[in-house]
Amino acid sequence: NDTLTVQVQNNKTWRDYIGVHFGTPKITVYLPEREYAMLTVHENTGNVEIPKDFAFTGADISVTTGNVRFFADVQDAKIKTSTGDIQVEDLSTGSLDLSVTTGKIMVSGVTCQGDVALSVSTGKTALTDITCRNLRSNGTTGTISLERVLADEAISVERSTGDVRFNGCDAAELSVKTGTGNVTGSLLTEKI
């Protein structure tokens, strides 16, 4: 059914974990450069990197502990990690939904036809050179910096604790809420 499934099954007993061990398992999957339908990755511990040579109609990536680096064009992407960083660069997308419990979100060079949604419980968010319809970011603890972020409709940022920094950003509507933190920066047009 044109589906590639890769699984690692651990058949070790507790005795296999006694002693000094070097190295961790690593899986590299090579595919022809072309557009694929859905990319689904569910990983407990490990890093995931998707290079720019691919295109997908959808991507659903979930990692418990590890970093995700995503560079491929995708129609709709949902990337989540509990502990780790998410890096998205130089791609076109229909929608982008990124979520980190503890870690950083770094997005740069993204053209999004729809909405960008970002959620960070604890960690920094850095957004650079993004165009989209709407951008929504919420978080508990951590600084968010937006540089040259342009939204056709709205930019909404909420933080419990942390600074919000704008540099050369704009949207028809702008909403910023922070419990403890400073809001600084520059917008391209005046807001009331």
Predicted regions and their residues:
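Acidic (Asp/Glu) and glycine-rich low-complexity loops/linkers
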Residues: 1-63, 67-81, 85-100, 104-120, ...
